[in-house]
């Protein structure tokens, strides 16, 4: 199935010059959303995943149905101040400054095989920070899965030590 036909390109959003890839027009078609999820599930089965981890918010949209299909748990990575219990955190760079990502300190057990999911691989900064959180807790990043990769932003270069699945490339 050609998933690109279900992604809407929104010009000049959120700012001029950006061609935003809107996945809601993929998700609102149950058979297409299921197909995309199933592709990631098949990839994850080969990796013997114990836990799925995804950064907010679209990492949840991808990761939760994958975790459900695999029969494993899901651990959210959130911005600072959004998780209620003790967390670990990591600072990461954005094009306009810095931000902080957190995960519950007890979310991952040492040695657990983790699949990281997100909707889009752009510069790789968010996923690089997510990897640091997973590894700090002793998790093993067994794979990383994205719906979309923006190849021209070279985010994959930051993640060259990891196995990556992308369902669409632009």
UniProtKB/Swiss-Prot annotation:
Enzyme class: transferase
Keywords: Cytoplasm, Glycosyltransferase, Purine salvage, Transferase
Signal peptide: none
Pathway: Purine metabolism; AMP biosynthesis via salvage pathway; AMP from adenine: step 1/1
Claim: Transferase is one of the keywords in the record: yes
Record's catalysed reaction(s): AMP + diphosphate = 5-phospho-alpha-D-ribose 1-diphosphate + adenine
Any single biological process term in GO: AMP salvage
Subunit record text: Homodimer.
Protein's name in the database: Adenine phosphoribosyltransferase
Organism: Bacillus subtilis (strain 168)
């Amino acid at each position: 199935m050609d998933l690109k036909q279900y992604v809407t390109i929104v010009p000049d959003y959120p700012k001029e010059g950006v061609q935003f890839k809107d996945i809601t027009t993929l998700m609102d078609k149950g058979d297409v959303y299921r197909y995309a999820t199933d592709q990631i599930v098949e990839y994850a089965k080969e990796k013997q995943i114990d836990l799925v981890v995804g950064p907010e918010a679209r990492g949840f949209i991808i990761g939760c149905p994958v975790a459900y299909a695999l029969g494993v748990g899901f651990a959210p990575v959130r911005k600072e101040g959004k998780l209620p219990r003790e967390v670990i955190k990591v600072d990461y760079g954005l094009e306009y400054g810095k931000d902080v990502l957190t995960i519950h300190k007890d979310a991952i057990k040492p040695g657990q095989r983790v699949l990281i999911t997100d909707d889009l691989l752009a510069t790789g900064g968010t996923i690089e920070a997510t990897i640091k959180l997973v590894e700090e807790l002793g998790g093993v990043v067994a794979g990383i899965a994205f719906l979309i990769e923006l190849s021209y932003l070279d985010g994959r270069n930051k993640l060259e030590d990891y196995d990556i699945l992308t369902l669409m490339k632009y």
